[in-house]
Amino acid sequence: MKENEKPDQKMYYRMLGGTGLQVSVLSFGFWATYGVKEGLTNEEGIIKAKECMSLARQKGINLFDNAETYGNPAGAAEEIMGEAMSQLQKEDQEIWRRSEIIVSTKIFWGGTGVNERGLSRKHINEGLDASLQRLQVDYVDLLFCHRPDPFTPTETIVRAMTDVVRSGRATAWGTSEWSAQQITEAYWMAIMQGLEPPQFEQPQYNMLKRDRVETEYHPLYQQPYQIGTTIWSPLASGILTGKYNDGIPEGSRLTQKGYEFLINNLELHKKRGSIEKIRKLADYASSNLGCSLTKLALAWCIKNKNVSTVILGITNPEQLKENLNCLSVTENLTSEQMKDIDEILDNKPEPYAGFGGQGMRQIVTI
């Protein structure tokens, strides 16, 4: 190491629920980046993905997250990730050995045909086969039901996912943006029939969206469920970087075709007074922690022990290096500072009451 050069930040790992798998607390995601943004498609996208994925592995990241619907056209992100990973494995077989890499994808939105989306047994099987081909792998470690499917019986979904896991095409399966009730129903349906239960959930979680992860899912982190979480949008699609405080910069995610719904989210946060809170958080991060708001927002997510991993949207190496520095912020965040942050946010959910909480009928007697 050169004089005055800082040592590499240590990567941390957590158990992903009851899967037995250890995942890096920061992971690499492909949503709204590769296969979509200018300069990140086709061959150019593969080159840039390789550069970022290579650095990610060197820094200890072991989970790479994708979905059949990511990219334009759908599946383009999987193709870029698959080709980049294939080339990297040939260039450095040791660091990219398959036994150390965790690959995840999600099934729900496939093609435009009536049977090319949803969670029918047909689409789960055909969608996964297509994803495996694009990713250039024999199996994925984590397979998610990208959303709940109200038109397919839960038992059908559980049986199809069980078949996928037991056929060796996925190591384990989980859900994304399912309610606690839906996850619980699927879990017990699997357990009672000797099938494979869901073992992880991918919810949105950040300083501005807390209720589901901190309250609704609370019972699911305990026995017997032991659900792990791979959280997405830790920066609220960039809102928590502060770059949208004074408008929408050209070339940002909110200007991309197909992501117009994010503008509605921004407007909603403005109405709720979130931008003023973000300014205060940025000042607090700078004056009390000596870091950027981005680092604080990521560190805050990791500080929650029920978060297994935080998915990053990385498009260049410098961005990755910056994000990795959030780990040192996490190490130094005190309980008093977390209370200060809660006071600024003023959105802490009510603690989970459980079966003995205020929601129960009380009997007053002597």
Predicted regions and their residues:
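Acidic-and-aromatic substrate-binding clefts and catalytic sites of carbohydrate-active enzymes
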Residues: 40, 69-80, 111, 149-153, ...
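Short, acidic/polar
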Residues: 42-56, 117-135, 183-188
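Active-site groove signature of glycoside hydrolases
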Residues: 132-153
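Beta/alpha (TIM)-barrel catalytic core signal, keyed to glycine-rich beta->alpha loops juxtaposed to Asp/Glu
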Residues: 3-6, 45, 148-343, 363-366
